[in-house]
Structure formats: C-alpha cells, structure tokens
Amino acid sequence: MSACRALRRPHSRRRSTVLAAGAALAALTLTACGSGNTSGGGGQTGFVQGAGGVDVVKDKGGRQSAPDLSGKTLDGKDLDVAEAYKGKIVVLNVWGSWCAPCRAEAKNLVAVANAYKDKGVEFVGLNTRDPDPAPALAFEKEFKVPYPSLYDSSGKLLLRFPKGSLNPQAIPSTVLIDRDGKIAARAIKPLGEDELREALDPLVAEK
C-alpha cells in the first residue's frame, strides 16, 4: 500500500504543476487583451483621470518625453515616429490581430484618424505579440487602416515607455503624444470614437 502511495505522489505533483501553469497562462492572456486595468505600474507620471477613462497630464511642463519609437513597419518600411511626425500630435495605438477588443476598437480609430488628418494629428499602430506580420496585415486590410504600424512582436518598443505610463500586459492601449513629443494622455482600454475625440480636442487646441 505504501508503495502505491509513493507512486501516486509524483503524478499528483506533476498534475498540480501543470494545472498551476495553465491557470497562470490563462490569467496572463486575460490581462493582456481587453483588461480594464488602468494601472501602468509605479512612477511619477502626472496622470489624472479624465473623461471616458482616459488619463491625462494637463500640465504641459509635467509631461514625460515619449521614447524612441523607430523600426520596421508591418510592410517592412523604416519608420521613426519622432522624425516623420515632428510637430504633429501622434496617436499611438498598441494592438494585436489576436486581440478581440482590438478588433472591436479598430473602426473607431480609423474613423477618427480620417477625421483628424487635416488637424495635424497622425496615427501610428504598435503591433505586438503577432509572431508573423501576415495576420496583422490581414487585420489592417479588413478594417481599412489608413496609417502604418510598427512591428513589435517581442514588445521591445512597448517596454521603452516610462515606468507607469503604460501597462505592457494591457492590450489594446492608446497613448497621445503632443506636438513637443511628450506623453499627454493614455487609455489602458479599448476606446470609443467619442472618447478619443474628447481626448484629442484639447491637444489640438493647445498652442
């Protein structure tokens, strides 16, 4: 009898380990796509909650600089956001083709991108965790996305953001960068069209 118990214990331990690993992976997946968590970690970011769950930094002097966002786009072109869109307001959306809330949000981003193009506002995507560009390119074609996306499968560019400004596990996320290249607002959630317009209008009006 004791021999049977001895044989069962390793199997039981292995099963517990597998179950625990599976639960951890499921939790990470849920957090990574469509999480309502608005925490971006520690750090003094100056964000205050604004309308529609968009966090803003109203004091221009308290805004942090956006990181270097340069690399290859999904279609293989070089893009340096700071250089290409100098003096423009930039809406940076973090997304993945695998993310259902990103799909729901896409039409809102496309509508606002088209509406604000003549107001000095540029949109850029940051595609993450897609192991191959093909599904992401299909996503862009399906939703008629008019702006480029940097391809960041490993999350390297995402991790360059100042501590506390973004939660790398919360996808989709959106960051608004002012004309001086400073982080002015963020949303750690999918955005509606009206929410994005309300966040952009004060930046467009800034002198």
What are these regions (language model features)?
Residues M1-S70, E206-K207:
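N-terminal targeting signals for export/organelle localization
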Residues D68-V90:
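A short beta-strand-turn-helix
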Residues V91-L92, F123:
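Hydrophobic beta-strand anchors of alpha/beta hydrolase catalytic cores
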Residues N93-C99:
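Aromatic-flanked redox-active Cys/Sec active sites in thiol-based oxidoreductases
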Residues C33, C99-C102:
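Short cysteine clusters
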Residues A138-V145, D152-A205:
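Thiol/disulfide oxidoreductase modules built on the thioredoxin-like
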Residues R103-F143, K156-R160:
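Structural microenvironment flanking redox-active thiols in thiol-disulfide oxidoreductases
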